[in-house]
Amino acid sequence: MANKKKPSIKKSVNEPNPHLKQSHASGSQQSLGDSLIEYNQPESSIPVCYIQNYPQFSDSYLYEPPFILSKVNEEVGHTVVHFLCTGNYETLRTASEPGASKIGIEFRRSMLVYQAAKEYDLYDLETYAKKYIEVFGESMSIFDIMEAAREIYSKLPKDEIWLTGYIYKQLEIAFSLDRNIFQRVDFYDGVGKDPNFDKDVMRMVVNIYSEVLSRQLDETTPEGSIAEDGAAEDCAAEDGAVEDGVVEEGAVEEGAVEEGAVEDGAVKDGAVEDGAVENGVAEECGAAEDVADDGALKEAVNLGIPSQPSGTALSFEWDHWTSGSKMGASFSGNSQWKYEKDTNSLYPENKAEESGGFNAAYEGIKSKKKKDKKKKKSNKDKKVEELAEPVPECGR
């Protein structure tokens, strides 16, 4: 369907085509065939009653036709419109890009849907997008996550905080698995494309390093202080013993004056013994300090970095479903996808070289862990509550 051009609205070359179109009749007079939103991927429209379920598409917008959804990327235009009609999340089958994994494509789409949902205050769609970002992000490297996030980061509202927190969490996880992750060449791919994104990521990296250093100080300082305090008390006790020896030595000297030179020899021997005691005290104090220093060194070396986890095989299953939208045919039926966490690869059961997409409310998606031959863990189905209430049908 060709869109009508209007002089007051400018469109860029790659701008998506979805737009709102005003109907001359009121909502109660319009039939199901009348449309307020149209888009051409594929050619279809949205009945009026569905639009009326969303307050953000108020009359103030409808009286200024056409309302162009310019913030919706054309790759997820179908997903947004399908959500408006059914309340569910759906992506279409498309040819895979060379070198791109199937699950990587769906992760990027989830990012694009999140950006569109934030722009037009579609809370339920935003909830879907967040969940799929987290699900598909489990198999993505930090480099792929940053690449997808960089594409939408500066397009989000200024008060957006969820994606920033998600990126920070993924950076922390990546650093805990590899202390040299921030020094790798791949980490700096794409730097300069979005200065705002680069600045925030740099701030996150500095915060992560600062937290690690602070944690080291908190863990090492109290133990070192306790060791030093204990050694100081021991030294003080020994000093007290020496002082007592000095007092006794004074008494011996007085006795030596009265009794004779023989006792002077005894006093001298006592003085030698006192010197030996003092040397022993010094050696004990030095040993205590060495033990404290060794403990601090071991604590400083140990950053508490966990070992790299072994690869985990997960499977996603979509049960039978049919498209409830009026958008035309889309990918449907039985499909089972499997990806390996270590290889970031997604394998559709039909082995087709395309991204199959999926259609289901989130409750229909199950995540399973396969049995491990060594550990023999039992399979557990993930039960996830429904994220969005179904949109009521027209006329009800």
Curated annotation (Swiss-Prot):
Record has Ion transport as a keyword: no
Classification of source organism: Eukaryota, Fungi, Dikarya, Ascomycota, Pezizomycotina
Protein purpose: Part of the subtelomeric hrmA-associated cluster (HAC) containing genes that alter the hyphal surface (such as reduced total chitin or increased beta-glucan exposure) and perturb inter-hyphal interactions within the developing biofilms, resulting in a loss of vertically aligned polarized growing filaments. Consequently, this hypoxia-typic morphotype (called H-MORPH) with altered biofilm architecture leads to increased hypoxia fitness, increased host inflammation, rapid disease progression, and mortality in a murine model of invasive aspergillosis.
Entries under PANTHER family matching the protein: BTB DOMAIN-CONTAINING PROTEIN (PTHR37538:SF1)
Keyword DNA damage in record: no
GO BP: any one term: cell adhesion
Inducers of expression: Expression is regulated by the hypoxia responsive morphology factor A (hrmA).
Region (Disordered), start-end ranges: 1-32, 347-396
Compositionally biased tracts (Basic residues): 367-380
Keywords: Cell adhesion, Virulence
Protein name (database record): Subtelomeric hrmA-associated cluster protein AFUA_5G14930
Organism field: Aspergillus fumigatus (strain ATCC MYA-4609 / CBS 101355 / FGSC A1100 / Af293) (Neosartorya fumigata)
Composition bias type Polar residues, residue spans: 23-32
